[in-house]
């Protein structure tokens, strides 16, 4: 499909064309060289789920993402070390959203999960003076920036508090992707994420099989603890095989059987006859 660089007024006003807005948009890829996302740019794009953009966009006007209730993934083309408008975007999205940084060939190098949060107001004075309350660790996660650069250490530090407030699935999302990409991941942060994964291995197994994503499955099977032991032990792999069979996911079953045979098989003891 070829799109012309320039459209005349007759093209724009054709009656058989539909305006590209609202719930017609599900995924948008913004080109390199863009400098600004204008006011109300994606207003009422209620089915927009994925937005890919260059990390060097420098400005985002207010309410650009109003009513984008299904936006769950931002893909930043560039390095997490780049200065970006990400904080401005996140400040306009209070629902759960993931951010993935990818290089030019599309390969991901880091991913973060920003939990949902909500705002409430308490009246504390007779002259309509209100106190703003932020509920949820998602707000704190969105403040993990310094000079427009995302600060991983600050982001990782919210996890211990988030355990008491956020759902198991969302916490597994945060922990799992931090371990997979391990971008600027300290030893202490890695330990806390590993501990959570080990204690919630069964649920993580269910989520991975449900997604039917061979890449995610392979990443999980490759995870090791500090003693170089696989996180996926015999019991976990056996449970996942049962789930894959139940879900009729043959590719996942093949990967699991191969991993079990190559890494978890107990060597047969020699038998001596006297």
Residue spans of the language-model regions?
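Charge-dense, extended regions
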Residues: 219-221, 242-274
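Structural signature of tandem-repeat unit edges
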Residues: 1-36, 46-59, 69-180, 188, ...
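Surface-exposed repetitive/solenoidal architectures
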Residues: 8, 185-190, 212, 270-274
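Hydrophobic/aromatic side-chain positions at a characteristic register within alpha-helices
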Residues: 208-212, 245-248
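Short low-complexity, flexible loop/linker segments enriched in glycine and/or proline
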Residues: 66-67, 88-91, 246, 251
């Amino acid at each position: 499909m070829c799109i012309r660089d320039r459209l005349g007024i007759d093209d724009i006003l054709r009656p058989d064309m539909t305006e590209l807005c609202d719930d017609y948009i599900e995924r948008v890829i913004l080109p390199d060289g863009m400098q600004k996302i204008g006011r109300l740019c994606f207003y009422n794009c209620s089915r927009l789920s994925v937005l890919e953009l260059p990390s060097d966009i420098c400005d985002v006007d207010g309410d650009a993402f109003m009513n984008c209730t299904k936006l769950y993934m931002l893909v930043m083309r560039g390095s997490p070390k780049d200065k970006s408008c990400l904080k401005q975007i996140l400040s306009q999205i209070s629902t759960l959203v993931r951010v993935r940084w990818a290089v030019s060939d599309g390969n991901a190098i880091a991913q973060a999960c920003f939990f949902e949060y909500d705002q409430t107001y308490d009246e504390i004075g007779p002259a309509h003076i209100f106190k703003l309350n932020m509920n949820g660790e998602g707000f704190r996660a969105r403040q993990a920036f310094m000079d427009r650069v995302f600060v991983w250490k600050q982001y990782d530090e919210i996890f211990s508090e988030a355990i008491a407030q956020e759902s198991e699935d969302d916490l597994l999302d945060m922990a799992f992707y931090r371990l997979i990409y391990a971008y600027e991941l300290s030893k202490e942060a890695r330990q806390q994420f590993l501990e959570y994964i080990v204690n919630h291995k069964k649920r993580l197994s269910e989520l991975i099989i449900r997604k039917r994503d061979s890449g995610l499955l392979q990443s999980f099977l490759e995870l090791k603890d500090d003693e170089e032991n696989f996180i996926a032990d015999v019991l976990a792999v056996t449970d996942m095989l049962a789930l894959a069979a139940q879900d009729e996911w043959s590719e996942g079953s093949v990967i699991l059987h191969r991993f079990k045979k190559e890494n978890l098989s107990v060597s047969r003891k020699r038998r001596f006859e006297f």
